[in-house]
């Protein structure tokens, strides 16, 4: 029986290690620690291994920002692609290990013997890049597109039509070796000529990585006017649209960075410059049909976005240790956004041919509780609504604190101020209430409700009393309780009961939490209690003899496309119920605004519509 063998250098030897592959950096880090101890200070001027670690950190952060416009391929990067390209940094690991062996050998000069800058070394590197690296990569790349080499090696790199910056590193060991030789040839020549420098090492490697990432970013960053004014530049630098044609058609545009070699080799795609111009002018720009308007929660979660850490944002938010050293940088961005910023696009996906986007107001959770910031936040939300209206967006759904009752009356402020809005503004809380209510077992006769006089609490109480379920409403305000009770039909008002202490619920096993509970307050719940909740942030589960529900959420339909970002702490494909409520509002084509108080009579209608469109409870 014949045994199929994998092609040489087609898989990574440390693949079985999983995340433990980063232990391979151990000897390099150990060398730096040893030199640090010997010298009594950070060996910045004497340790190549330290420079390798610094380069590793800088290379791993090479990334480009998404923009609303200028996307080359309209498709999004979904979870399947992210998982497939998860180990994009294998090439960086390999290059770091090879470099560590070279720099610790006697052949390589010590950093103390090198100048910080040598212009002649830079000139040599440029000449060697054009004369050696570019043609070598071009012909190697063309060879990789031949039958057996393509199927055994290069086809993996072409797995997806929509590329991202990290796709640049998603290669086999053979391709990685080719790229390493191509990238390092100019450095080797400059050092052999005696004109190497520290700046050349940093500058060349980071510029090489940046240009590779730029090409794969799928975002056009060079103006077509640059090529119109200086036509010769078309042959000296490629563009993301240029590379996208290669990934799409696979028979042209093979160059590394310089289209000149495609022109000389007869493989330059004639559509390259026209496509670049169209993308730059925004001709392929598409107006979103639905927008979910969020805000930043806190400094750490601000890094949970695809244009900062694609891998982290593809998983439910958690405080990863790798994010903590970057906290000062994220804090700096928060300060910058406080003074000069505007609403920006976070992510997008497609559902049944319609484009859905998530926009973010550049404000953090704590800022919503600063009285002096209220006016500015409302102005930002208002500008986002007006921009969406001008663009032709059909529905805009407000998330979390953007629809805070004290801030803007759940969106009522904007609808009243702009009565002619074409975009429908919704808070999505009708579906949020429906999700919570449908979690409650049918045999429950009594519930305990905190946050009872809030917008959601009111709707939940009025709905349950109509089902003849006794609702213990925790509130100190008799006036607010009476106002809600009077809204209920006379025959059901008896089922709404005001309580002022948690002790009143010590025999009730169904708690609906709309206000944060401390461990002491949770103690009053009897054993076996289930905590349903609509409080943000979710309560911490201190009781081991009780169960805790998650925030109201729904799973998007299975035919969603291009979804590659988790919504805060939600799982993959799961969104907050208010987000789902906006989606349902759009899919149904409802023409009313959903702002202010929740219409209890519409809860069942919205729930049934959500199920009809393929959304399911998460």
Curated annotation (Swiss-Prot):
One of its GO terms (molecular function) is iron ion binding. Keywords: Endoplasmic reticulum, Lyase, Membrane, NADP, Transmembrane, Transmembrane helix. The chain crosses the membrane at residues 9-29, 46-66, 91-111, 121-141, 174-194, 289-309, 315-335. One of its GO terms (biological process) is response to abscisic acid. Expressed in germinating seeds and stamens. It is a multi-pass membrane protein. It is found in: Endoplasmic reticulum membrane. InterPro entries: CER1-like_C, Fatty_acid_hydroxylase, NAD(P)-bd_dom_sf, Sterol_Desaturase_Related. Residues 127-267 form the Fatty acid hydroxylase domain. Pfam families: CER1-like_C, FA_hydroxylase. Its EC number is 4.1.99.5. It catalyses: a long-chain fatty aldehyde + 2 NADPH + O2 + H(+) = a long-chain alkane + formate + 2 NADP(+) + H2O. GO terms for cellular component: endoplasmic reticulum membrane. The keyword Acetylation does not apply. Induction: Induced by salt stress and abscisic acid (ABA). Belongs to the sterol desaturase family. Aldehyde decarbonylase involved in the conversion of aldehydes to alkanes. Core component of a very-long-chain alkane synthesis complex. Homodimer. This is Very-long-chain aldehyde decarbonylase GL1-3. The gene is GL1-3.
